């Protein structure tokens, strides 16, 4: 039986190992000669992000509960959290507290920790959570509790993802897992050297196949020289549909259950669309459409948002069949899967329909199809190798959208001013890593917020710490300067000393969008990304609020 202390040491060794091979070897050596039950537990806890158990608490909630347990200042603990990881903060205050004395020696087994996590996932009341967290702390050393909290937080900070961990079991375990998503089955079959026998398991989610961005038509043909399908990119929600007899399961892009109000209607229509299917797995997109089957905007699937579209209903656009009545179809070419889908599915107008697909043979044809999609206010196209197999979790497709054209610079970018900053988390804890971007409102003479922006590399962040002149306000509403109009949810840790002397950044994104939380007339940017610093501009030449309003109007008239 593996002890928590042994597991902690393994995590420490993995963290300090230099590369993929060394990390995997450490895990392989550790699990050698252990039985399947023990190996399964070790691998499962090394991958807390894949664990289905939900603990109903984020970092701030964990801080709140342990501030009560330790009788420590919640504000002090939150401030400490701003400089690093949740595990380090809890360990620090556990060591200092006088309510529960940390154990001198580690006594917990991994099985006991796993049992605790299962129990914790079953409670939702704060009083019950406090009791469980108190009980586990009473049998922990400081380092034990740090590890337990990081398991609750679903991030051990060992710099080793699923590929590193699973391939320690067998060289192809990771690829097999992306298809089956059944860790226990992989461990049992790896011991028998029988991984090839593992297939899709109906009612268990499969890692969806993904797409990478493509910024030109020419690049698409270099990627798929033997031909491609161009499929409309629907602005809805990816849904993986599983049917087994009269049971149904619906999983999102991240393999979590889809909210019932979005998919319950499908239980009536899927048996009608697939009359011969006993068990089936479909890859699809659920979209709200109007009475003419025209897709409505992203985000309209929400209960409250849907009420704005009275004559609408949810429609499933099916683009792939991965499994049908005992037959795993992921290893056959796409054109065959699509042909099979046409044979077994009957469309139900406005409820279950085929995705719009075009067989592309030349660049001119692809350009025409893309122009048509954008003219119809659709998001773009997904391009797929006509002979491609379905590779779970891999980015083998291409997505080509309005904002990816022109070498990646999009039409709807804005030159925004850095107004503030937030502490980063994890490895970026203690430094400014996320930035509040905004624009000047000539009418009020105030600065308004548009979006938050992150994604800088470590070197850039290091330079920005010195380049940006900031004043620390610690999210205190009383310290917001008069020149800044910001809603409570976006009050930063720092504000710039003078916005008129601050940096101007070109910010691009998927599209301008509406946000009640931002103060620039509710205008924001969906999926914002930093493009470059506009050193050639002063604040006067930056995008002002009236420019932003005009820009969104002109873009909306085009798209």
Swiss-Prot record:
Q: Which NCBIfam families match?
A: dnl1
Keyword Mitochondrion found: no
Q: What induces it?
A: Expressed in the early phase of the viral replicative cycle.
Question: InterPro entries under this entry?
Answer: ATP-dep_DNA_ligase (IPR050191), DNA_ligase_ATP-dep (IPR000977), DNA_ligase_ATP-dep_C (IPR012309), DNA_ligase_ATP-dep_cent (IPR012310), DNA_ligase_ATP-dep_CS (IPR016059), DNA_ligase_ATP-dep_N (IPR012308), DNA_ligase_N_sf (IPR036599), NA-bd_OB-fold (IPR012340)
GO MF, one annotated term: DNA ligase (ATP) activity
- For this protein, the Enzyme Commission number is 6.5.1.1
**Leading EC class:** ligase
Q: Which residues bind ATP?
A: 231, 238, 285, 384, 399
Q: Which residues act catalytically here?
A: 233 (n6-amp-lysine intermediate)
> Some GO term, biological process aspect, for this entry: which one?
DNA biosynthetic process
Q: How does it assemble?
A: Interacts with host TOP2A and TOP2B.
> What does the function comment of this entry state?
DNA ligase that seals nicks in double-stranded DNA during DNA replication, DNA recombination and DNA repair. Recruits cellular topoisomerase II to sites of viral replication and assembly.
Amino-acid positions noted as binding Mg(2+) 2 in the UniProt annotation, renumbered to this chain: 379
Which UniProt keywords are listed?
ATP-binding, Cell cycle, Cell division, DNA damage, DNA recombination, DNA repair, DNA replication, Early protein, Host cytoplasm, Ligase, Magnesium, Metal-binding, Nucleotide-binding
> Which positions are annotated as binding Mg(2+) 1?
285
Tell me what this protein is called.
Answer: DNA ligase
Q: What cofactors does the UniProt entry give for this protein? A: Mg(2+)
Q: Superkingdom, according to UniProt?
A: Viruses
Q: Which organism is it from?
A: Monkeypox virus
Chemical reaction(s) catalysed: ATP + (deoxyribonucleotide)n-3'-hydroxyl + 5'-phospho-(deoxyribonucleotide)m = (deoxyribonucleotide)n+m + AMP + diphosphate
Family matches, as PROSITE patterns? DNA_LIGASE_A1, DNA_LIGASE_A2, DNA_LIGASE_A3
Recorded family membership: Belongs to the ATP-dependent DNA ligase family.
PANTHER family to which the protein is assigned, alphabetical: DNA LIGASE 1/3 FAMILY MEMBER (PTHR45674), DNA LIGASE 3 (PTHR45674:SF9)
Any one annotated GO CC term: host cell cytoplasm
Subcellular location(s): the record lists:
Host cytoplasm
């Amino acid at each position: 039986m593996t002890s928590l202390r042994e597991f902690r040491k393994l995590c420490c060794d993995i963290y300090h190992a230099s590369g993929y091979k060394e990390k995997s070897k450490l895990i392989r050596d550790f699990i050698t000669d252990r039985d399947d039950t023990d190996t399964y537990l070790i691998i499962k806890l090394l991958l807390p992000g894949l664990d289905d158990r939900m603990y109903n608490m984020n970092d701030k909630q964990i801080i709140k509960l342990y501030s009560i347990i330790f009788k420590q200042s919640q504000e002090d603990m939150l401030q400490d959290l701003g400089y690093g990881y949740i595990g380090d903060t809890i360990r620090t205050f556990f060591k200092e507290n006088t309510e529960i004395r940390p154990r001198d020696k580690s006594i917990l087994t991994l099985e006991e920790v796993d049992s605790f996590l299962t129990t914790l996932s079953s409670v939702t009341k704060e009083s019950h959570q406090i009791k469980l967290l108190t009980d586990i702390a009473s049998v922990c050393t400081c380092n034990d509790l740090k590890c337990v909290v990081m398991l609750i937080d679903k991030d051990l900070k060992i710099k080793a993802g699923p590929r590193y961990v699973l391939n320690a079991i067998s060289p192809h375990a990771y690829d097999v897992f992306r298809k089956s998503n059944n860790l226990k089955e992989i461990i049992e079959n790896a011991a028998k050297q029988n991984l090839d026998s593992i297939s899709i398991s109906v009612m268990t989610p499969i890692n969806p196949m993904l797409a990478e961005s493509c910024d030109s038509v020419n690049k698409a043909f270099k990627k798929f020289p033997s031909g491609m399908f161009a499929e409309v990119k629907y602005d809805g929600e990816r849904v993986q549909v599983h049917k087994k007899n009269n049971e149904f399961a619906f999983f999102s892009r991240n393999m979590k259950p889809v909210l019932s109000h979005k998919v319950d209607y499908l239980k009536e229509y899927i048996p009608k669309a697939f009359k011969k299917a006993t068990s089936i797995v479909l890859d699809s997109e659920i979209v709200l459409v109007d009475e003419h089957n025209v897709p409505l905007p992203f985000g309209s699937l929400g209960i409250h948002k849907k009420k704005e579209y009275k004559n609408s209903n949810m429609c499933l656009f099916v683009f792939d069949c991965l499994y049908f009545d005992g037959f795993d179809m992921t290893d056959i070419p796409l054109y065959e899967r699509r042909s099979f889908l046409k044979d077994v599915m009957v469309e139900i107008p406005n409820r279950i329909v085929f995705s719009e697909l075009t067989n592309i043979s030349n660049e001119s044809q692809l350009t025409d199809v893309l122009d048509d999609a954008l003219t119809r206010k659709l998001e773009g196209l997904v391009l797929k190798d006509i002979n491609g197999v379905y590779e779970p979790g891999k980015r083998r497709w291409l997505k080509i959208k309005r904002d990816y054209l022109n070498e990646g610079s999009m039409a709807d970018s804005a030159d925004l001013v850095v107004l503030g900053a937030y502490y980063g988390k994890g490895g970026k804890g203690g430094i400014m890593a996320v930035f509040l971007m905004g624009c000047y409102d000539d009418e009020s003479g105030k600065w308004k917020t548009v979006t938050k922006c992150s994604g800088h590399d470590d070197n850039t962040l290091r330079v920005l710490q010195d380049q940006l002149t900031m004043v620390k306000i610690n999210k205190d509403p009383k310290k917001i300067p008069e020149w800044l109009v910001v809603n409570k949810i976006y009050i930063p840790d720092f504000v710039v000393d003078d916005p008129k002397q601050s940096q101007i950044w070109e910010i691009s994104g998927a599209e301008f969008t509406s946000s009640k939380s931002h103060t620039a007339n509710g205008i924001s940017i969906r999926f914002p990304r930093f493009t470059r610093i506009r050193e050639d501009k002063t604040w006067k030449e930056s995008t002002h609020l009236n420019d932003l309003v005009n820009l969104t109007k002109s873009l909306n008239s085009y798209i």
